[in-house]
Amino acid sequence: MSVTSDILKLKKEKNAVILAHYYVDEDVQEVADYVGDSFYLSKVATKVDQDIIVFAGVEFMGESAKILNPKKKVLMPEPGADCPMAHMATKEEILKMREQYDDLAVVCYINSTAELKTYSDVCVTSSNAVKIVKNLPNKNIFFIPDQNLGRFVAKQVPEKNVILNKGFCPRHVAITEDMVVETKKKYPQAKLAAHPECTEEVLKYADYIGSTSGIIDYVVDTDLSLIHISEPTRHAQI
């Protein structure tokens, strides 16, 4: 019996559902019931009927699923899978900011630990961060933990005083302006789609900026060639 058959058999026996992030291997995505970005999978986690949620992703995703559906058992296939950025803010920093600003809302990116979420006022994803921040009554916004997404949001809501944390995604910041310029020279007619976790030096060249699912939709709906700059292989795929 193949591994795939074993997984499907156990899934049925245990009354489990498998959620997989776009970032996991293709083989894992093929046995998953739902594949998507953090926002989509968070919504799915609140609606599934199965007793067990198997979350193929990093730790904060499993934590989020448990927070949203506390009566379900949530299992992580790889307990060591983690997002470094999720730990790049502290409760001490949040408490310090609350002392400095009376009219403050702490906006926590979903890519963060459960502890950080408990000290925040609202949790957002890259899909809805701008909309939520824009509609908050607070003038001062402490955006954690990703400074690049926070900076992107700040530009969309100039009426807010967005205070940035120093966190970042190691993978996204590994994509540099030089890499973009070099690739654009090679493929001058191509479009560039980028995630807002990239640096502003990269985002200024982007034809589209959005969440993982947004980028996929953009690729599907666009007829022109698209640049995909990959790290660490650093090559362009058309």
Where are these regions (language model features)?
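Short hydrophobic/aromatic-enriched beta-strand-loop microsegments
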Residues: 33-41, 71-81, 122-129, 160-169, ...
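Redox- and metal-dependent alpha/beta enzyme cores, enriched for Fe-S-associated oxidoreductases
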Residues: 168-208, 212-226
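Active-site cofactor/substrate anionic-group-binding motifs, chiefly glycine-
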Residues: 41-84
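Active-site beta->alpha loop and helix N-cap motifs at the rims of alpha/beta catalytic domains
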Residues: 66, 71-98, 105-108, 112-117, ...
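Single conserved hydrophobic/aromatic residue that forms the stacking wall/gate
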Residues: 227-238
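N-terminal glycine-rich anion-binding loops that anchor highly charged ligand groups
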Residues: 15-24, 28-30
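Active-site glycine-rich loop that binds ribose-phosphate moieties when present
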Residues: 87-96, 115, 121-136, 143-149, ...
